[in-house]
Design a protein with these regions (language model features):
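Glycine-rich phosphate-binding/hydrolytic loop that grips phosphoryl groups
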Residues: 154, 276, 294-334
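Glycine-rich phosphate-binding loops at beta-strand->alpha-helix junctions
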Residues: 242, 264-294, 298-300
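Adenine-nucleotide phosphate-binding core of ATP-dependent small-molecule kinases
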Residues: 207, 218-268, 275, 322
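Active-site neighborhood for divalent-cation/phosphate handling
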Residues: 56, 60-160, 268, 298-305, ...
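Non-catalytic, solvent-exposed interaction/assembly segments
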Residues: 1-88, 129-131, 137-141
Length: 334
């Protein structure tokens, strides 16, 4: 779990606070909260440790309970679209329309065929309600519930000057879910959540090496070595195997996008999240995609408070991208 607090400045944003709080394994599974009390307590501990006074927050959700689709609807006035969006959504989502929260963003108000193109987002009400409740139980006030893929996009676009011709594959690697978002000119062309993340490295190292979870996690991030200062070859072999599986999942999504999208000229891949610095994963992705790859810097254009630990911020910059995107949101915006 991460918290980011930004302050708007005349020429951009300034970072006031950043921190992370570990969650007990299986507390959240595929984006669904399994232990609400544990999540609320983790939020309280994080707020206390960072000495945060801000009560109004934005949060992100992901997983199979969230559906994002690009659809076309008959052109109509904005107020008519708002009134009819649930009827339109019913044709495109696998959930009952009364069981979901729905939002949308118009990407093209009028196509050549006289239709309106938009991104439709639907999330199960019970999942949204659970996330809102754990935040309230931590004595905070949720103002925005965003989608993780879009929050990472917001954080990325705030930090990078993009050529309108660039088509970027933005992949945020979470603990158990990775968010894939293909973006051009500020518009999301394709999104998909895949149920593989950084935990796959930890779990496989633990299984193959017969060691405790915390030691396996240390090996994953390069913090546990032999007496000679060398990561065991067995660990490297396991990391490479998981990297191949993960890269294969990402490539299948990219292949689907390329096969179904006209003018799909992808220019690069940008990784974010806790496992974005795993070098064997870089090699596996680059070999499959044949595209240049870089790791996101969430603080690239963010002013840093001199009292904050720059080494800590640098080490965890890729993990903060979603938090940066969320911290730029405010209640009532779109």
């Amino acid at each position: 779990m991460k918290a980011v607090q930004l302050k708007r400045k005349t020429n951009g944003w300034a970072l006031q606070a950043f921190g992370m709080q570990p969650l007990v394994p299986q507390t959240i599974v595929d984006g669904t909260i399994m232990d609400q009390g544990a999540v609320s307590e983790a939020i309280r501990q994080l707020w206390s440790r960072l000495k945060l006074r801000q009560k109004e927050v934005a949060i992100a959700i992901a997983g199979h309970s969230v559906i994002i689709k690009k659809i076309a609807v008959p052109m109509m006035k904005p107020e008519e679209l708002a009134a009819n969006i649930r009827n339109e959504a019913e044709h495109h989502i696998p959930f009952g329309r009364d069981d979901v929260e729905i939002d949308y963003h118009v990407t093209n108000p009028m196509t050549a065929s006289g239709q309106t193109e938009l991104l439709l987002v639907a999330a199960k009400k019970e999942v949204v309600s659970d996330y809102i409740q754990v935040v309230r139980d931590a004595n905070l006030s949720p103002q925005v519930v965003d989608v993780a893929a879009f929050a990472s996009q917001n954080g990325f676009e705030a930090n990078y000057q993009l050529d309108p011709r660039d088509t970027v594959v933005l992949i945020n690697i979470g603990a158990a879910i990775s968010n894939i978002n293909i973006v051009r000119s500020g518009v999301s062309l394709f999104t998909r959540d895949v149920t593989i993340g950084g935990n796959a490295f930890t779990e496989e190292i633990q299984k193959q090496m017969g060691i405790a979870a915390d030691e396996a996690e240390a090996y994953k991030v390069g913090g546990s070595q032999t007496e000679d200062g060398v990561v065991p070859q067995e660990v490297l072999r396991v990391m490479e195997g998981v990297s191949e599986v993960m890269a294969g999942e990402f490539q299948r999504s990219l292949d689907f996008f390329l096969a179904t999208t006209a003018d799909a000229n992808v220019t690069r891949i940008v990784l974010a999240g806790g496992s974005s610095k795993v070098t064997s994963l870089h090699r596996a992705i680059e070999r499959r995609s044949r595209l240049p790859l870089e790791v996101a810097d969430a603080w690239k254009r963010v002013e840093i408070d001199p009292q904050l630990d720059r080494n800590y911020l640098s080490a965890h910059s890729p993990e903060a991208l979603i938090g940066v995107g969320l911290s730029m949101r405010s209640g009532g915006d779109k």
